[in-house]
Amino acid sequence: MQLLTSVAAAAVLASTVSAANFTGDVLNGVPVIHDLILADVPAQKISRYYLRVGELNGGHPVHIPVMVARGTPESLETGKTLSLSAAIHGDELNPVRVVQRIFEQLEGEVATLNGTVIGLPTVNPMGIYLNQRNYFTASASGSLTNVNRVFPGTAPALGGSGPDILAFNIWNQLWANASAVDVGIDLHTPSSGGETSLWCYADWRAPYVERLSKLLQPDTLKVDVGEPGSIETTFVDYGVPSLTVEMGQAKVWNTSLIDRTVDFVNRVMRDLHIAPGNGTVEPDLSRVYIANTFHDTYTQYGGFVERLVAVDEPVTKGQPIAHVRNAFGDILETLVSPADGRMFQSPRDPSCEPGSSVGQIAYNSTDPECADGCILSGPAGSRRR
């Protein structure tokens, strides 16, 4: 951590609008805030802040970077606010570059924006540091927490742990306060070891979410009720349209998928009239596979997975999709597709243990209980969600 002297800090703060609840600290030349108030952010420019979101053992503060592209002065009243969040899972890195690219682009456009874009390129600082999915809490023997299951978080005074407080501060000091987010897009990849193309979770019961999901023009669009405690579902529960976007693989920057997602964000900004555009944005759905059900197939053995079907290939019920082999190369198990559909996620890491996924199939179930979305597992189709 590189804190400036009080004189240098004062100089930095003097060059910004004097508000936004600054803590008085400056980290790597960037002012630290504990609360974002858009009215206090300079209009027609991009501002950078660090938001203080908690503490580690030893009292070391935790910060996350925040970028704000605030448009014309009147756009706080006339325009909408879009939030882009990335890397709540620390190994999911394609989204980081999407947020960076959008704000690089907005440098030349912010003066005319009718609205505001808030960017969080790295939501989970502990996950980023450890280059893995979860937030590490050091107390006792240590534990790992999926931060995308604890929103809107828990306050320190109510016994919140590190990840709970991180979520609490992001929600209450950034999104649900005077920033008044109108649309939230949470960017992900699959967990390490898995591969997909471009897809999304979308709760079509919520206003504007169907439109938002189609603007993505994904390879697979999963109609889904969402996960309690996730960013997407928390936004939706509070009446804010939101989408979870999944991009390719963890721990890589896939330029093609980054480009497609940047294009998506631009379509959303035009659709919300934050950015200028000619006419209504018409998404191209000609290659979009819309499904209400994901069905996971898992192995009962430890060994090595041999994929037989690539991502986005069509499959038929009973078609072999993977072999599981032992160390000698013998086939221990052949997994088959549970239904006619499409391979939407497949393991890139061949190493597996009992219970590991060897492929997830997307399809449309005729079960009325799956009309708003289902996630099933195993040969019997046990319902996980």
Regions found by a protein language model. Give the residues of each.
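Ordered, small/hydrophobic-rich secondary-structure cores
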Residues: M1-A11
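Structured catalytic-domain cores with a bias toward divalent-metal coordination
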Residues: L3-T5, V17-R385
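Hydrophobic h-region of N-terminal signal peptides that target proteins for export
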Residues: A10-S18
